[in-house]
């Protein structure tokens, strides 16, 4: 297989990968994992111990809005229920150079994405009769300079019981402790069940073949480390899983919100849909907690709302970092991402880091590249003998195959030697592809000149054009043309086809491919010099 055919193989594999991936997004429906369908559609989950008599099923008026802020985000919490109804990520712009913080959680008429939590059950305060209307001493709370933690209590009293919903924000952290402290000064034992859920407007993914994105639910349980559960899945079958530990989340490109319940408790993961209001919820419900008269109890949970920062998420909850979804090539993508961040920490430029990763990958793959070109050179040396066999045996395909295999054995040539290195390189490319798509670190990351966002397409299409030109040059430097006229025409158009494909790809990925082609050209010349000394290659065609 000569290098032009190699390009054709790469193109076919790459296009097949893109088509398969888009098919997965559009048509693949996983088997439902629900074991029980909850038929109640409401703001809070139905009680496991009774009917829906204690469930709030109608929208309620808004309470006061309390602002909580640390150095990385600003939250707005409604005193009615203590729900987080708005969040702004202070370190991330909504648009490139907009100086406007990115809004993750929001509660608008046309788009709902909020984080709710409360207490239900026998003596719950989030019921059909209404939700807790908390009292807060102040309207705005901000983490002060030199302060590492900010705790803000929301207080509600009912029938001799004081409920404190305490939000704890930490410096530099996107996870919030949301704890219920219950002081039972009544004359009887009370029972409550904690819950946390994320409510989101039912939406469809807005990605495309070049940059697929996912907006929908996900969860982790004791049986499953990480699994997506899309809004379409929720409409078909409500999630219902009993687990110890685990979490529930809503994902979108680069960002995630997740509820992490008490990891030592037995929790129920669930989803609900409210088609009338075009809403879906994914959440957890904790076990019954009994608080005797005169006793105090604390029920703990955490909420993550922010970017997909793998290192931080891994410390917050087991497998939460898997929400950075590298697909089946994760075992290659993770070390590549580590290498990318390591190089960036040295060069302080993500574009240069991509070039550095490309250099390292091509250096590691150089033995395979050399083996590929050596195999192709040997195959070219055998072409006269193979042509003679074709003329001698004519239509006798079986005899011709036998003689060809005999010739390969005598000359110690592997006819697949040129294909194998390409097949081995494809998983690495796919892993890099997903790394560049999933890494929030590349969002709005500049390179040089006109490339100010490596996660977006080149605004002037310069990199795709250069990439196409490098493919064309690589083709022309191939030692022999493709003999078949049809293949020749296909190969002549291949750089143009790839260039058009890459017009809409993230510029970081195009930069990788461009640099990879340039390195391949340099390696090709180095390998050819060695083959010339062995008499396996001639620069004169």
UniProtKB/Swiss-Prot annotation:
TM regions (residue ranges) = 7-27, 346-368, 416-436, 454-474, 495-515
Q: Where in the cell is it found?
A: Cell inner membrane
Q: Which Pfam families match?
A: 60KD_IMP (PF02096), YidC_periplas (PF14849)
Report the InterPro entries cross-referenced here. Answer: Membr_insert_YidC, Membr_insert_YidC_N, YidC/ALB3/OXA1/COX18, YidC/Oxa/ALB_C, YidC_ALB_C, YidC_periplasmic_sf
Provide the primary localization: membrane
Alphabetized, the UniProt keywords read:
Cell inner membrane, Cell membrane, Chaperone, Membrane, Protein transport, Transmembrane, Transmembrane helix, Transport
One GO-annotated biological process of the protein: protein insertion into membrane
The entry lists its GO molecular-function terms as: membrane insertase activity
Q: Which GO terms describe its cellular component?
A: plasma membrane
Topology with regard to the membrane?
Answer: Multi-pass membrane protein
Q: What does this protein do?
A: Required for the insertion and/or proper folding and/or complex formation of integral membrane proteins into the membrane. Involved in integration of membrane proteins that insert both dependently and independently of the Sec translocase complex, as well as at least some lipoproteins. Aids folding of multispanning membrane proteins.
The record's similarity note reads:
Belongs to the OXA1/ALB3/YidC family. Type 1 subfamily.
Q: How does it assemble?
A: Interacts with the Sec translocase complex via SecD. Specifically interacts with transmembrane segments of nascent integral membrane proteins during membrane integration.
Stored HAMAP family: YidC_type1
According to UniProt, the name of this protein is Membrane protein insertase YidC
According to its UniProt entry, this protein's organism is Pasteurella multocida (strain Pm70)
Q: What is the lineage of its organism?
A: Bacteria, Pseudomonadati, Pseudomonadota, Gammaproteobacteria, Pasteurellales
């Amino acid at each position: 297989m000569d290098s032009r055919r190699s390009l054709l193989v790469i193109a076919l594999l790459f296009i097949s990968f893109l088509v398969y991936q888009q098919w997965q997004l559009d048509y693949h429906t996983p088997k439902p994992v629900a074991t029980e369908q909850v038929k109640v559609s409401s703001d809070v989950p139905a009680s496991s111990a009774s009917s829906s008599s204690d469930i709030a099923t109608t929208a309620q008026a808004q309470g006061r809005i309390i602002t909580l802020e640390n150095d990385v985000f600003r939250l707005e919490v409604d005193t009615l229920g203590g729900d987080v109804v708005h969040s702004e990520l202070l370190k991330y712009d909504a648009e490139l150079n907009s100086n406007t913080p990115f809004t993750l959680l929001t509660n608008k008429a046309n788009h709902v994405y909020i984080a709710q939590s409360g207490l239900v059950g026998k003596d719950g305060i989030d019921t059909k009769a209404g939700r807790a209307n908390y009292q807060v001493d102040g309207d705005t709370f901000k983490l002060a300079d030199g302060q590492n933690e900010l705790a803000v209590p929301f207080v509600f009293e009912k029938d001799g019981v004081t409920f404190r919903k305490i939000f704890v924000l930490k410096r530099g952290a996107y996870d919030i402790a949301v704890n219920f402290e219950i002081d039972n000064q009544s004359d009887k034992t009370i029972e409550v069940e904690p819950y946390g859920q994320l409510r989101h407007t039912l939406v469809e993914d807005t990605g495309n073949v070049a940059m697929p994105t996912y907006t929908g639910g996900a969860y982790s349980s004791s049986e499953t480390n990480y699994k997506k559960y899309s809004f379409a899945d929720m409409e078909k079958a409500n999630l219902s899983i009993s687990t110890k530990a685990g979490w529930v989340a809503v994902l979108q490109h680069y960002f995630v919100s997740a509820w992490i319940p008490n990891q030592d408790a037995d929790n129920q993961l669930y989803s609900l849909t409210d088609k009338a209001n075009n809403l879906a919820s994914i959440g957890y419900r904790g076990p019954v907690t009994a608080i005797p008269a005169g006793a105090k109890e604390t029920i703990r949970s955490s909420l993550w709302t922010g970017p997909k920062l793998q290192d931080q998420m891994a410390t917050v909850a087991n497998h939460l970092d898997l929400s950075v979804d590298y697909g089946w090539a994760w075992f290659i993508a993770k070390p590549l991402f580590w290498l990318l961040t390591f190089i960036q920490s040295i060069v302080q430029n993500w574009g240069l880091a991509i070039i550095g990763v490309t250099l390292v990958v091509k250096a590691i793959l150089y033995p395979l590249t050399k083996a590929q070109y050596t195999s192709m050179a040997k195959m070219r040396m055998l072409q006269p003998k193979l042509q003679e066999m074709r003329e001698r045996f004519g239509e006798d395909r079986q005899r011709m195959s036998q003689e060809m295999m005999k010739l390969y054995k005598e000359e110690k040539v592997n006819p697949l030697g040129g294909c194998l290195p390409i097949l081995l390189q494809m998983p690495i490319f796919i892993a890099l592809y997903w790394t560049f798509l999933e890494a929030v670190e590349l969002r709005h990351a500049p390179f040089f000149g006109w490339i100010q966002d490596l996660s977006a397409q080149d605004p002037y299409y310069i990199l795709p054009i250069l990439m196409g030109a490098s493919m064309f040059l690589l083709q022309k430097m191939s030692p022999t043309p493709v003999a078949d006229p049809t293949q020749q025409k296909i190969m002549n158009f291949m750089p143009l086809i790839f260039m058009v494909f890459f017009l809409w790809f993230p510029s970081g990925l195009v930069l990788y491919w461009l640099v990879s082609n340039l390195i391949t050209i340099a390696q090709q010349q180095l390998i050819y010099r060695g083959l010339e000394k062995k008499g396996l290659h001639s620069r004169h065609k």
